[in-house]
Design a protein with these regions (language model features):
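Flexible "cap/lid" loop of the alpha/beta hydrolase fold
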Residues: 132-136, 142-174
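Active-site loop/oxyanion-hole signature of alpha/beta-hydrolase fold enzymes
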Residues: 33-36, 75, 80-122, 126, ...
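Catalytic histidine-centered segment of alpha/beta-hydrolase-like enzymes
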Residues: 263-276
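Conserved alpha/beta-hydrolase catalytic His-Asp/Glu region
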Residues: 156-158, 172-228
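Conserved HGGG/HGGXW glycine-rich cap/lid loop of the alpha/beta-hydrolase fold
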Residues: 34, 38, 43-89
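Conserved serine/cysteine hydrolase catalytic core
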Residues: 207-259, 268
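Short N-terminal helix/helix-N-cap motif within the alpha/beta-hydrolase-1
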Residues: 62-66, 89-92, 156, 268-271
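N-terminal cap/lid segment of alpha/beta-hydrolase-fold proteins
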Residues: 16-39
């Protein structure tokens, strides 16, 4: 549990997670994370039991997970999702501060704001890596972890490593070129994803996020961290990424591996029905 000396939990906030309301509520929450002021765009639903924290990937927003309310497996369960700093509707006073460690601290501060002790977590791509680092730092708080193509090895940096492979004169030019390359990718839903990037991400955060993702993937011992977690885990990947070298290793070490058909890196765009079915099945039987 976060120390009360570090995080101040408003008494009125903790009650939000115990209401009987079943709809998602949108709100803004002001936080100070590592000296940077945030106005975090949050969607949440109260309920009974430990909440599910949803962390979106780079270039996406909290709305990737809004359909959770349509899934009966989550009826009555508290839900928390938000736009990461530099993404969506969240406002961040210092975009240059944003990195994976910064995103981990953002998650910890928001959990403290809602007085959350333990929780389930679902993270995609950048959000999966954020969730992994959070779970590694506080393993007793994480009840289960669904990692949707979040980084666990150097080979996972096919997007983020472009910050080194395709240098540009400035952040805006790199981002424009990145969008064009992504639009032309042969992976499912890449053009759809690329078309909204300008609206969902500030160019100024790209370098900090991508550089930290590459650094952690190359030198952060991520596979050991993931396999060492004591909670039930699932790794979800798209059919086009069947060639990931570590899938059998995950299975041999007790991680449930789930494959989404007709999908690359973005199951929430390519095959959301199957993605939600797999997520729901895991929450019903997490230890199988």
């Amino acid at each position: 549990m976060p120390s009360p000396n570090v995080y101040t939990v408003p008494q009125s906030t903790s009650a939000l997670m115990m209401s009987s309301n079943t709809e998602l509520t949108k709100t803004s929450i002001e936080l100070d994370v590592l000296g940077a002021r945030l106005k975090l765009a949050v969607m949440y639903r109260p309920g009974e039991g430990a909440p599910v924290l949803f962390l979106h990937g780079f270039g996406s927003t909290k709305e990737d997970y809004a359909d959770v309310v349509l899934n009966q497996a989550f009826d009555g369960r508290p839900i928390i999702a938000y736009d990461a700093p530099g993404c969506g509707e969240t406002e961040c006073a210092d975009l240059n501060a944003v990195s994976i460690p910064f995103l981990v601290e953002t998650a910890r501060h928001l959990l403290a704001h809602f007085a959350v002790v333990d929780f389930h977590v679902v993270g995609h791509s950048m959000g999966g890596l954020t969730a992994l680092m959070l779970a590694d730092a506080e393993p007793t708080r994480v009840l289960s972890f669904i990692n949707i193509e979040g980084n666990v090895a150097p080979e996972d940096c096919f997007l983020s490593r472009q910050i080194a492979d395709f240098p540009a004169e400035n952040a805006e030019l790199f981002f424009e070129n990145f969008i064009e390359r992504t639009w032309r990718s042969r992976y499912h839903s890449s053009a759809l994803y690329a078309a909204s990037l300008r609206h969902k991400v500030r160019a100024a955060v790209v370098r900090g996020i991508f550089t930290s993702m590459v650094e952690l993937s190359d030198h952060g011992d991520l596979m050991r961290r993931f396999l060492s977690l004591p909670c039930p885990r699932m790794f979800m990947h798209g059919e086009q990424n069947d060639g990931l070298s570590y899938l059998s290793n995950l299975q041999e070490n007790g991680v449930r591996v789930a494959r989404v058909r007709s999908c690359g890196h973005f199951p929430m765009y390519s095959n959301p029905v199957e993605m939600w079915s797999l997520i729901a099945d895991f929450f019903r039987f997490p230890d199988e």
